[in-house]
Swiss-Prot record:
Primary location group: secreted
InterPro entries hit by this protein: Cystine-knot_cytokine, TGF-b_C, TGF-b_propeptide, TGF-beta-rel, TGFb_CS
Function: Acts specifically as a negative regulator of skeletal muscle growth.
Gene that encodes the chain: MSTN
Disulfide partners: C281-C340, C309-C372, C313-C374
Subunit structure: Homodimer; disulfide-linked. Interacts with WFIKKN2, leading to inhibit its activity. Interacts with FSTL3.
Keywords annotated in UniProt: Cleavage on pair of basic residues, Cytokine, Disulfide bond, Glycoprotein, Growth factor, Heparin-binding, Secreted, Signal
Protein name in the entry: Growth/differentiation factor 8
Organism: Vulpes vulpes
Length: 375
């Protein structure tokens, strides 16, 4: 009994010397550790976001087969951009980003962008295009985007200046050919007739698919065309060489080519917002702003939701392949572990100038992260 009392006295003495225990200190330390963990997660996500933006810039140039971003200023874009109905419809109405994630899928498509529409502007005329010492409009050069795809539709768009009184307009589209023995330099393509009323000018489209297909088969036969739109008094109403106040009224070709459908496979994933404390693999929002890059050569969209993946990957969590966990169990030291990566991506539609100042409307694959997983 006496021995027990001695032990109790010693214990009380130790408590007095050590002083009171501050339980709040442990909770404060725990809170600091949690805050530090959250801070590290935020920093990691910010670094991942920055890397994703840089990767997107590189991917876009690579997928569009551009070595560098086209050097086209905002003012130049305003001058080159046709004020024509088909282009305005693309800018105002087309779906800049597909939201119809029909099947969760990782696109099984080619790496490069798929062209759907090309707006070809007239190129500068050369000596072959000059008749009687005068340049004629118009001569069009065609990129590989048209040459190696099936042409579905080809429309020549011309702008007719306004008239003061009702009149009938005779449109002539003439194809320039090599001089024949009798001196003939032209052959007719189309000669539509239309009625115009006083008011604003109008855009008129003419089907030139057959002519374009012939040019693609025999490029040497492409010497250009001449455009005329004569009213009843013989005045030419067609804008071929725009004057003051006629920017964006140049003739142009609208060419539509085929697009190949892609196969898909299913997958699943989880989403989080930027304020989430979740440390596991998730998809986070990311908006890419092309104007912030100074990429004025991209006509539309000016920005799009790209998203990115970030987070830790525990084994058997959102794994893309079921055998990943088995491989790690068989050889835990030889496996680096799964990584948080996109498992479903979708394309975006883009309207842009290429290096030849042609306007392209096409689809760029795998630019939007729809789902994330561990693989």
């Amino acid at each position: 009994m006496q021995r027990l009392q001695i032990c109790v006295y010693i214990y009380l003495f130790v408590l007095i010397v050590a002083g009171p225990v501050d339980l709040s200190e442990n909770s404060e330390q725990k809170e600091n550790v949690e805050k530090e963990g959250l801070c590290n997660a935020c920093t990691w996500r910010q670094n991942t976001k920055s890397s994703r933006i840089e990767a997107i810039k590189i991917q876009i140039l690579s997928k569009l087969r551009l070595e560098t971003a086209p050097n086209i200023s905002r003012d130049a874009v305003r001058q080159l951009l046709p004020r024509a109905p088909p282009l305005r419809e693309l800018i105002d109405q087309y779906d800049v980003q597909r939201d119809d994630s029909s099947d969760g899928s990782l696109e099984d498509d080619d790496y490069h962008a798929t062209t759907e529409t090309v707006i070809a502007m007239p190129a500068e005329t050369d000596l072959l295009m000059q008749v009687e010492g005068k340049p004629k409009c118009c001569f069009f050069k065609f990129s590989s985007k048209i040459q190696y795809n099936k042409v579905v539709k080809a429309q020549l768009w011309i702008y007719l200046r306004p008239v003061k009184t009702p009149t009938t307009v005779f449109v002539q589209i003439l194809r320039l050919i090599k001089p024949m023995k009798d001196g003939t330099r032209y052959t007719g393509i189309r000669s539509p007739k239309l009625d115009m009323n006083p008011g604003t000018g109008i855009w008129q489209s003419i089907d030139v698919k057959t002519v374009l297909q012939n040019w693609l088969k025999q490029p040497e036969s492409n010497l250009g065309i001449e455009i005329k739109a004569l009213d009843e008094n013989g005045h030419d109403l067609a804008v071929t060489f725009p004057g003051p106040g006629e920017d964006g009224l140049n003739p142009f070709l609208e060419v539509k080519v085929t697009d190949t459908p892609k196969r898909s496979r299913r997958d699943f994933g989880l989403d989080c917002d930027e304020h989430s404390t979740e440390s596991r693999c998730r998809r986070y929002p990311l908006t890419v702003d092309f104007e912030a890059f100074g990429w004025d050569w991209i006509i539309a969209p000016k920005r799009y939701k790209a998203n990115y993946c970030s987070g830790e990957c525990e084994f058997v969590f959102l794994q893309k392949y079921p055998h990943t966990h088995l491989v790690h169990q068989a050889n835990p030291r030889g496996s680096a572990g799964p990584c948080c990566t996109p498992t479903k991506m979708s394309p975006i539609n883009m309207l842009y100038f290429n290096g030849k100042e042609q306007i392209i409307y096409g689809k760029i694959p795998a630019m939007v992260v729809d789902r994330c997983g561990c693989s």
